[in-house]
Curated annotation (Swiss-Prot):
Assigned keywords, A-Z: Cytoplasm, Hydrolase, Metal-binding, Metalloprotease, Nucleus, Protease, Zinc
Active site: E299 (proton acceptor), Y386 (proton donor)
GO function terms (MF aspect): aminopeptidase activity; epoxide hydrolase activity; metallopeptidase activity; zinc ion binding
Role: Aminopeptidase that preferentially cleaves di- and tripeptides. Also has low epoxide hydrolase activity (in vitro). Can hydrolyze the epoxide leukotriene LTA(4) but it forms preferentially 5,6-dihydroxy-7,9,11,14-eicosatetraenoic acid rather than the cytokine leukotriene B(4) as the product compared to the homologous mammalian enzyme (in vitro).
UniProt protein name: Leucine aminopeptidase 2
Organism lineage: Eukaryota, Fungi, Dikarya, Ascomycota, Pezizomycotina
Cofactor: Zn(2+)
Family indicated by similarity: Belongs to the peptidase M1 family.
Binding locations of Zn(2+): H298, H302, E321
SUPFAM superfamilies linked: ARM repeat, Leukotriene A4 hydrolase N-terminal domain, Metalloproteases ('zincins'), catalytic domain
Residues annotated to bind substrate: Q134, C135, Q136, P269, Y270, G271, G272, M273, E274
Record PANTHER family: LEUKOTRIENE A-4 HYDROLASE (PTHR45726:SF3)
Length: 608
C-alpha cells in the first residue's frame, strides 16, 4: 500500500521523474490547455501493466505512450474528494528502471479547483485579466493528470504560452516565439522555465497577468502589478537578503538559485505559498510599515523544510509546517533578538488555542499525526501542524540543549534532501544522530512519542519570555475597567505585533467591551483606517464581540477587499453571530472575488 491515502495513483509501481508542461493560457475561455509529458520510471519488473494517475475535472483528449497514440486508457468514476483516476494500459508492463513517456493532451474545465481567474474588474488597475494557481494540497490533479502526492518528486520544464507575462515555479529562461493573435486578439509569447531540483506536484505553480518586476536583493526580485511595484519593493528590500543569509547559517546554503516574491491580487487565499523560485504572497503583507515581512521569513524557510525535504503525505504535514515555523522563528531571533522568538511563539500559541477550540480538544485534526483516509486534506488545514509542530521541535531543542540540537538541523536537511519522509523516519533519524551522544540520548529517553504524535488537544505549554508582551497584557488589563479612558500615547512606540497581542488579550475577555468602549479604542489607537489587516481584522473581532454596530459595515467592506482565509473565515464566523443577514449578503456579493478553496470553506462555515 502506498503511504499517502490522498492519491489514487499507483506510485509504488511507477514514479514520475520528469514533467514537461507545454500549456497555453486562454483568458477568454478561462482555460489552460496543451500537452503534459510525464516521464515515469517502472519500479517493478513488468509486474504493473497500467499507470494510474490522479485527475479531477480535467478534460483528457488524447494520450500517447512513448510517442505512439493509444486508445487503451479510461477515466474512471469520480471518487470524492480525490477525483477520477486515469488508467493507461501498458501491455506487458516494463522492466524495472525503464522510463515510459506519457504525452497527455488536456484542457482544464470550469470546475478546476487549482486555478483562479480574475476579470480585469477584479484586479487593481482594472486593465487586464489575471490568473494564478494554488495546488496545495491536492489540486494539481485539476490542472493535468499527475501522481498528485508529496511522496513523488519530479524535475520540470515549463513552456507556457500567454498574451500576458508568466511566472512559474522554475528558473526563467526568457520569452520567445511571438505569435500574432487572430480577430484582433492580443499576440502571445512562449515563456520557458526549468526546475532541476525534483519537487512534489503541489509545488507546480503558474501565474499570468499584468506583472512588473523589480530587484529586492542580489538574488531576489519582487513581481506584482505595476502600480503596486514600488510599494512592494520598499516593503521587502530591507530584509529579504538578510533573511536568506541568516537561515543559510542555520541550515546550509540556499539551493534554488533565486528567491523571488510574487505579490498576488487580494483574493489569494493564503498568507503565502512557498512555490520554488517564486514565493506567492498575499498583498496583506504590503502594509506600508514592514511589520508583516515575517511571512517572507516563513516562506523562505520552506525552501529547506517542505521544498527540499517534504512530508510524504498530508498526514505528516507538521514535518513541513512545524519545521518551517521553527526556522522562521530562528531567523527572527537572529535578526531581532531571542525575545522576539518567544514573542512570535506567544502569538502562535493563541492561534493554536483557537484551532483546538474550533475543532474541539478531542478532534482527530488536533493531533500532530492525523488520519486522512477518505478525507480532504484542505478540511484539516489549521494552525495545528504549524504551532503544535513548532512546539514539538522547540521541546526537543530545550531537551538536548540548543548548541547540541543545532548540529542536528543541517544533518536532518542533508539526510532527507530531495526526498520525502514521514514522522517515524524523522524519529529514527533523530535518535540515530544522537546515539553516540550519551547525554542527548539519555534526555531523549523521556520523550513520550505516542503522546506527541497521537494525543489530541494542546501540548504542554512552555515558559515563554514575556518581556515583549507584558505591556500588551498590562494595557489589556486596564480595558477591563469600564472607566478606562484611552489615549494614543498608550501604544506609542509599539510594533504592530504588540498591538496584535493586546487585541488578542481583549478578545479573551469573558465579558466583551461595550460598544462605546469599542469605538473609543478604534479612535484612540487608529484601528479603523489602518492599512495593516492584521490590526483592522482583530479590532473588528473585538468590535463584533462588543456588538458595536459601527464596525459591521467596515467588516463587510474588508471582506470584499481581502481574500486571505485567515482573515476571511474568522470575520465571517464572528459576523454571523451578530448579523447573519449581513454575513450572507456580503458572501453573496463577494463569492466570485474569493478563490475556489476559500469560497468552499466559507460556504461550509455559513451552513454550520
Amino acid at each position: 500500500m502506498p503511504r499517502d491515502p490522498n492519491t489514487l495513483s499507483n506510485y509504488n509501481n511507477w514514479r514520475t521523474k520528469h514533467t514537461i508542461a507545454d500549456l497555453a493560457i486562454d483568458f477568454k475561455k478561462q482555460r489552460v490547455h496543451g500537452t503534459v509529458t510525464l516521464q515515469l520510471e517502472s519500479i517493478t519488473d513488468k509486474e504493473s501493466e497500467e499507470i494510474i494517475l490522479d485527475t479531477s475535472f480535467v478534460d483528457v483528449q488524447k494520450i500517447a505512450v512513448d510517442g505512439s497514440k493509444t486508445e487503451e486508457w479510461v477515466l474512471k468514476e469520480r471518487n470524492e474528494p480525490y477525483g477520477s483516476p486515469l488508467s493507461v494500459k501498458i501491455p506487458g508492463g516494463a522492466a524495472k528502471g525503464t522510463i515510459i513517456a506519457l504525452d497527455i493532451t488536456i484542457s482544464t474545465t470550469d470546475k478546476c479547483t487549482a486555478l483562479q481567474w480574475l476579470t480585469p474588474a477584479q484586479t487593481s488597475n482594472k486593465k487586464f485579466p489575471y490568473m494564478f494557481s494554488q495546488c496545495q494540497a491536492i489540486h494539481n490533479r485539476s490542472i493535468f493528470p499527475c501522481q498528485d502526492t508529496p511522496d513523488v518528486k519530479s524535475t520540470y520544464d515549463f513552456r507556457i504560452r500567454s498574451p500576458l507575462p508568466v511566472l512559474a515555479s522554475g528558473l526563467p529562461r526568457g520569452a520567445a516565439s511571438f505569435v500574432h493573435g487572430e480577430n484582433g486578439e492580443s499576440g502571445t509569447l512562449l515563456y520557458s522555465f526549468y526546475q532541476e531540483i525534483p519537487m512534489p506536484s503541489y509545488l507546480f505553480a503558474l501565474s499570468s497577468g499584468d506583472i512588473a518586476t523589480a530587484s529586492i536583493g542580489s538574488r531576489s526580485l519582487v513581481s506584482t502589478g505595476p502600480e503596486e511595484l514600488l510599494g512592494a519593493k520598499w516593503e521587502l528590500e530591507r530584509d529579504t537578503e538578510k533573511f536568506i543569509e541568516t537561515i543559510e547559517k542555520i541550515v546550509y546554503p540556499y539551493e534554488w538559485t533565486q528567491y523571488n516574491v510574487l505579490v498576488l491580487p487580494p483574493s489569494f487565499p493564503y498568507g503565502g505559498m512557498e512555490n520554488p523560485v517564486f514565493t506567492f504572497a498575499t498583498p496583506t503583507i504590503i502594509s506600508g510599515d514592514r511589520e508583516n515581512v515575517d511571512v517572507i521569513a516563513h516562506e523562505l524557510a520552506h525552501s529547506w523544510s517542505g521544498n527540499l525535504v517534504s512530508n510524504a503525505s498530508w498526514e505528516h504535514f507538521w514535518l513541513n509546517e512545524g519545521w518551517t515555523v521553527y526556522l522562521e522563528r530562528r531567523i527572527i531571533a537572529a535578526v531581532h533578538g531571542e525575545a522576539y522568538r518567544d514573542f512570535s511563539s506567544i502569538i502562535g500559541w493563541k492561534a493554536l488555542e483557537d484551532s483546538v477550540k474550533l475543532f474541539g480538544e478531542d478532534h482527530e485534526f488536533t493531533k500532530l499525526v492525523v488520519d486522512l483516509k477518505g478525507k480532504d486534506p484542505d478540511d484539516a488545514f489549521s494552525s495545528v501542524p504549524y504551532e503544535k509542530g513548532f512546539h514539538f521541535l522547540y521541546y526537543l531543542e530545550r531537551l538536548v540543549g540548543k548548541p547540541t540540537w543545532d548540529k542536528f538541523i543541517p544533518h536532518y536537511f542533508t539526510t532527507w534532501k530531495k526526498k520525502s519522509l514521514d514522522s517515524y523516519e524523522f524519529k529514527a533519524t533523530l535518535l540515530d544522530f544522537f546515539a553516540s551522544d550519551e547525554a542527548a540520548s539519555k534526555a531523549l529517553e523521556s520523550v513520550d512519542w505516542d503522546s506527541w504524535f497521537y494525543k489530541p488537544g494542546l501540548p504542554p505549554k512552555p515558559e515563554f519570555d514575556t518581556s515583549l508582551v507584558d505591556k500588551c497584557y498590562a494595557l489589556a488589563k486596564k480595558w477591563e475597567s469600564k472607566d478606562f479612558v484611552p489615549s494614543p500615547s498608550d501604544i506609542e512606540g509599539w510594533s504592530a505585533n504588540q498591538v496584535v497581542v493586546f487585541l488578542q488579550q481583549v478578545q479573551l475577555f469573558t465579558t466583551p467591551l461595550t460598544p462605546s468602549q469599542s469605538q473609543a479604542m478604534g479612535k484612540a489607537y487608529s484601528l479603523v483606517d489602518t492599512q495593516n489587516v492584521e490590526l483592522s481584522s482583530r479590532y473588528f473581532g473585538v468590535g463584533l464581540a462588543a456588538k458595536d454596530e459601527s464596525v459591521y459595515l467596515p467588516t463587510a467592506e474588508l471582506l470584499g477587499k481581502v481574500g486571505r482565509m485567515k482573515f476571511v473565515r474568522t470575520l465571517y464566523r464572528k459576523l454571523l453571530v451578530v448579523d447573519r443577514k449581513l454575513a450572507e449578503e456580503t458572501f453573496e456579493k463577494n463569492k466570485d472575488f474569493y478563490h475556489p478553496i476559500c469560497r468552499e470553506q466559507v460556504e461550509k462555515d455559513l451552513k454550520e
